[in-house]
């Protein structure tokens, strides 16, 4: 165990630099705003800075922990259930995995509290069942080789059909649920499952089908919550603003974070427990991994646990009040339109601080053998989130229905999926679920809510929906990146024979024969 810990120290330094590169731009933007056009109280600013420090350390531990534990666990489990070749076993275990992982996702508790007219347990069990069911569909797609775009047309068609019958006060929360439930706990494990299942197939389409699980799992919660909205007629969703901190000294500042730590220690322990138990069962029944591999996974799980506790504490206690207050101040200006470009700027950088984005970018680079670099993926995601936050702020200022953005957006995204390489489509729809993580829920959503309060809008219909918007735009930007790559490849293939012909044309006949 000591050897594993020592070996991980250089990696921790590398991850610390990555975390600083992700969080420092956001902190710098907020500081510039605070010292210029959006003054905030010292209490809020100090909480934000301490929260940023905790997020940096949290990302450092989580990203290394996910590499060491969640990814190998998911890949091994995915491979072993596929090796059984028994469809009922594969589908049954797939449903159970999806259900158990989702039911313990911390962000799902937050979603349940936003919809008071539906009993919390009913909502949580329904959403978990939705994820489990669509993980089964995802496994079937991979094993049978069903086209992802065709399934997306079918299921998103069902979603928008149901949306016509859901109360408008409930619509945005329902679409937010798809992004909320694919959080930092579920994404690394589910993505690794996909790689493990596709690796057993070993055919030429295996890499294309290794992505798409998160995309399918994001559909289940939306359908489940829309159906519940029709059944319960949930039109009385309420908004409880975050309490703005007031501290007079450093001890009170630490107390704010210290009081919340036990909550997140318990939440993350409960979240990790089902994954650990399921992996333990597989280890005793089928995996039989050696001690060193198990030790590495144990250290990785410890890093993951510490990282997520620090990250969520920093985000919820430090970032959420700052986001809400900044939104109020910016939208309260005489030039309230400033919230749109400021939101876009923050959105561009904030996605880089999403824990699961690191896992996605690294896995994309590995599966594509570097054809899609982590940097290119990061740029495509940042551009997508920037656009989505800008559109979300337009909604806050104008009160336009979210469907005016989601319907054309998804129609375009699914439409181009039929001409874009399959791998890019699967990655793009996975990226939507990954980008809309806890940083969106704890900073961008409060930013929109604060702005909505300042302009006197309807919080439930106008501010909620930011998560859904953030989940939608990467579907377009990542696929457009794939389309550009495809066109460049075709152009290079056309130019290659012409270039060779031109080179030979300039040589004498004797030289050509010698060649």
What is the role of each PLM region?
Residues 1-19, 23, 74-88, 203-213, ...:
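Intrinsically disordered, low-complexity non-transmembrane regions of multi-pass membrane transporters
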Residues 24-37, 51-61, 93-100, 130-141, ...:
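Hydrophobic core segments of alpha-helical transmembrane domains in multi-pass membrane transport
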